[in-house]
């Protein structure tokens, strides 16, 4: 009979004080699979209603910005995956999809009424003048798209349409 953390045939397991194997639960800082009882590694696990964490090769929850299987995710300090959130990480803004939690790339996202951002191929909110889908657009220093305002760009005072935000060349 065994108690505590044990490695058997290269797999990590945990046994309670009553010698029962931990399955589908956390113990000793690790999560143990509900079927096999093996410590879970390199996999997402559900930690609450629509709340997920990712366990690294050591079975520990990851935190911060993480590249996992070619996708970019963010995990809060408690290891819970960010979903449906605009977050700033190391001075760059990212938006994480409300369903998948993946960083949004190459698309516009409306954060609130009238507040739009565009996220590039790296998942970062763009700033300054951008040409997107053939239209000249402008994003302020915070990444918000400018609409219905004049902005100084390249020494010119430019107006950006109130509806779509495109530069109106003759106004």
Tell me what each language-model feature is:
Residues 1-171:
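Extracellular adhesion/carbohydrate-binding repeat motifs centered on closely spaced tryptophans
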